[in-house]
């Protein structure tokens, strides 16, 4: 009888635990591995970024192409060290952001010279690379993995090799520095006058805030989100327009 009473008393707590567990997205972006490996440090990618990407995000694809073997070494490292469920959230985010950016660069190099990533047939939809045992497309990494991790600042970290995209950082994202890197990226993008024109009563902003508006409205409006980073305080009733997106190559 005491055992039954004890179990009944536990039911609310068990129900709550199950509810919390169900509210957490399944880690489709990480695997279970009995021989769990440590998160990689992305140093190989960092060295290449320092060499071929300026502080303003311009990419020397011509020079990068001469170092494609070094890039492939890093891509092989990514393929052999997919995220583990034992990794921290920041380590997993850093992995997928770097993977997206590195494979975007590889895609451009494979088709270089060109004027725009849109000159490539279905650049985001085709499954062009393998990580672990699974084939991925850039689209899948962005929409099925990164966006599902409920971190809107990823939109300022992943780069689509185009002028209107957030600048490609010349630093690799890392587990230890991720928070400060994402904050710096968000602030830089919002206040970049080539991406957004902001005044108190009127804003002309990147189409990113239109395409992914839901990602930025989880705790308020898009204007509320912008005001977290904007150097100019935007009035809540400000007129909103969106800039034409420039898909020219970011070289």
Q: Model-flagged regions — what are they?
A:
Residues 20-97, 101-251:
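Interaction/scaffold regions that mediate signaling and macromolecular assembly across diverse proteins
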Residues 1-27:
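Bacterial Sec-dependent N-terminal signal peptides
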């Amino acid at each position: 009888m005491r055992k039954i009473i004890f179990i009944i008393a536990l039911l609310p707590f068990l129900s709550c635990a199950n509810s919390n567990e169900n509210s957490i997205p399944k880690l489709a972006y990480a695997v279970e591995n009995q021989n769990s490996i440590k998160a990689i440090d992305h140093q190989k990618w960092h060295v290449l970024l320092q060499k071929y990407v300026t502080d303003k995000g311009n990419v020397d694809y011509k020079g990068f192409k001469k170092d494609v073997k070094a890039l492939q070494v890093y891509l092989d490292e990514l393929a052999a060290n997919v995220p583990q469920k034992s990794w921290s959230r920041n380590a997993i985010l850093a992995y997928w952001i770097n993977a997206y950016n590195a494979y975007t660069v590889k895609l451009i190099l494979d088709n270089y010279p060109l004027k725009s990533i849109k000159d490539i047939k279905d650049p985001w939809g085709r499954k062009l690379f393998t990580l672990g045992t699974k084939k991925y497309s850039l689209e899948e990494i962005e929409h099925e993995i990164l966006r599902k991790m409920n971190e809107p600042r990823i939109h300022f970290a992943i780069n689509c090799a185009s002028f209107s995209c957030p600048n490609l950082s010349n630093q690799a994202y890392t587990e230890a520095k991720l928070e400060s890197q994402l904050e710096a990226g968000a602030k830089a993008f919002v206040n970049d006058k080539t991406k957004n024109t902001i005044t108190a009563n009127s804003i002309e902003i990147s189409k990113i805030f239109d395409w992914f508006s839901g990602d930025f409205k989880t705790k308020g409006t898009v204007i509320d989100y912008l005001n977290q980073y904007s150097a100019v305080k935007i009035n809540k009733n400000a007129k909103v327009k969106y800039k034409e997106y420039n898909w020219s190559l970011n070289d």
